């Protein structure tokens, strides 16, 4: 069964959030992730319909943000998204007989990690912000319990909470591929991206240390490092990739160390 381990050493703790102090489930979640009640905090955590939800308090019209691996867009992509023909699958080296062990060093809401896990990869998600990690943990909890996907989710997806820079070097496991998708200003104006980017940029801030991820990722991965970038972004750390896989709005920069077998 997949484990959820924690390494809370980088972001100053505790993190202030607003939450209902009379709700035992919320109290337990916040205590576990070192989130403390603050009446003036810009973000609120709620537990609604068995789901942990993040709300930006000064924009009450925005829907709450959740991690959902069971329904919605990710479920549709799992069923109809093109399987191993997808660009992300090609980027990490998925092919017949090859299902890499992947570390997603910038997990976010876990969507790309879920795609890779649904295609057979074993994925460890690394997330350093405790609020985002709490959302991921809640999404995993519900997915692990799901009758359709729970069995393989427990086998293939796990969460490691800690700084990407430090945790990548401390993960004592065999890693074929490190996948990185650092926060980058988006030009996409879709409602979903605008909503999530507003919330995430306020909560997490920019990945100012993103360039520092490449070297430890290259040291950890035995086969390759894959960096997802907007099509207009510069190369991570100014390092030219071995190959580039382009999509409509993004590209995958692939830094190859050895052949996938």
Curated annotation (Swiss-Prot):
CDD domains, sorted: AdoMet_MTases
Residues binding S-adenosyl-L-methionine, per UniProt: 111-112, 127-128, 163-164, 181
The enzyme's E.C. designation: 2.1.1.242
Reactions the enzyme catalyzes: guanosine(1516) in 16S rRNA + S-adenosyl-L-methionine = N(2)-methylguanosine(1516) in 16S rRNA + S-adenosyl-L-homocysteine + H(+)
Cited SUPFAM superfamilies: S-adenosyl-L-methionine-dependent methyltransferases (SSF53335)
UniProt xrefs under InterPro entries: 16SrRNA_methylTrfase_J, SAM-dependent_MTases_sf
Compartments where located: Cytoplasm
rRNA processing listed as a keyword: yes
A matching Pfam family: SAM_MT
Molecular-function GO terms, alphabetical: rRNA (guanine-N2-)-methyltransferase activity
Keywords per UniProt: Cytoplasm, Methyltransferase, rRNA processing, S-adenosyl-L-methionine, Transferase
Gene3D superfamilies listed in its UniProt record: Vaccinia Virus protein VP39, YhiQ-like domain
Gene Ontology CC entries for this record: cytoplasm
Family membership noted in the UniProt record: Belongs to the methyltransferase superfamily. RsmJ family.
Function, as annotated: Specifically methylates the guanosine in position 1516 of 16S rRNA.
Protein name as catalogued: Ribosomal RNA small subunit methyltransferase J
């Amino acid at each position: 069964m997949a484990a959820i381990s924690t390494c809370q050493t980088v972001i100053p703790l505790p993190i202030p959030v607003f939450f209902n102090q009379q709700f035992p489930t919320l109290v337990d979640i916040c205590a576990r992730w070192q989130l403390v009640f603050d009446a003036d905090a810009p973000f609120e955590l709620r537990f609604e319909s068995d789901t942990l939800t993040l709300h930006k308090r000064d924009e009450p019209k925005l829907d709450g943000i959740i991690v959902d691996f069971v329904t919605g867009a990710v479920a549709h992509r799992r069923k109809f998204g093109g399987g191993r023909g997808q660009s992300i699958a090609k980027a990490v080296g998925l092919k017949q007989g090859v299902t890499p062990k992947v570390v997603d060093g910038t997990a976010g809401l876990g969507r790309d990690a879920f795609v890779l896990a649904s295609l057979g990869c074993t994925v460890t998600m690394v997330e350093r912000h405790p609020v985002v990690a709490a959302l991921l943990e809640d999404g995993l909890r519900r997915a692990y319990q799901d009758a359709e996907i729970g069995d393989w989710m427990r086998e293939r997806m796990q969460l490691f909470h800690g700084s990407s820079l430090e945790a990548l070097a401390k993960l004592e496991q065999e890693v074929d591929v490190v996948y990185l998708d650092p926060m980058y200003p988006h030009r996409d104006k879709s409602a979903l991206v605008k909503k999530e980017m507003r919330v995430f940029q306020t909560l997490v801030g920019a990945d100012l240390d993103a360039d520092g991820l490449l070297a430890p990722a290259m040291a950890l991965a035995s086969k390759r490092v894959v960096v997802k970038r907007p099509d207009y972004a510069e190369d991570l750390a100014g390092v030219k990739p071995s190959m580039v896989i382009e999509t409509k709005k993004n590209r995958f920069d692939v830094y190859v160390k050895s052949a996938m077998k």
